[in-house]
Amino acid sequence: MNKNDLQERMTDLAVRVIKMVDAMPTTISSQAMARQIIRSGTSPSANYRAACLAKSDKDFLNKLKMVEEELDETCHWLNIIMRAELVKSSRVQPLYQECCELLSIIVKSIVTTKTRMKSEENEKMKAKL
């Protein structure tokens, strides 16, 4: 999967979260959940976009970690929304699954980037010797 495909999936997730929130009831608890998930569910798209424009590997890694945190939080809120039955499970479950898949991809990207950075660092150390 290339970065454009991943960006598109992140944007789709944000749009789906917005639509789900608009379908939530207007109870106090629903509105509290809505505020939380609208923030965490839309920020991965913006943060991933920023990561793709990073000026260095370290900057890229830091931005990916923000994406990871927001996706994890979104999974958390989606789980609560499902368990509290604030929205039909048939609507939330696919969203939850996509969020978890994106989280897995980002975690793998973080691990890959760290491994590559460490390898490059080791190569620089060897070159100095």
Please place each PLM-identified region on the residue numbering.
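Short, C-terminally biased terminal segments at protein or domain edges
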Residues: 1-129
